[in-house]
Amino acid sequence: KGYKWEDMRDAFLQLCYDGVSFVTIHFTADLDLFSRANQIRKIPVTSRGGGMVLYDSRINNRTQNIFRENIDEIANIALKHNVVISLGTTFRPGTILDACDSVHIEETLRQLSICRLLQSKGVKVMVENIGHITLDKIATHSKLLSKFNAPIMPLGPLPTDAAINEDHIAN
């Protein structure tokens, strides 16, 4: 039932041996944010990978998700194999109605904390973030993102909801 760390670690190691450049990991797929997102959002979770981590946390009664529980080992593996960690975003807004809400901001702050922790261990990091945001909120959110000393990988079309379910075309 759920994931076993040994299996996840072995899959991560295999990717490293195969020569991948980066791996996306959802350290911020937290049940407290999920609970809040369910209460206030139109689309609570936008990430399939993050959703799987949330499901695992729920069925295994984890206080921290499987990746956060093993962050030190993940950092050591990434450092040893020169693999960049891409901080996945489980709660990026899937609609402009959820843009810059308390869940989005809190996840971004948690990503910032994890980014700094990994960088302090020598790990290279990039950050997935943004999602669907209206033009009037881009500057405010950009100020928060400017606190990262890491590249930002924007996901989702910033100023439009005109192509819902067609991000691959609208971007």
Model-identified regions with their sequence ranges:
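Alpha/beta enzyme core
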Residues: 1-171
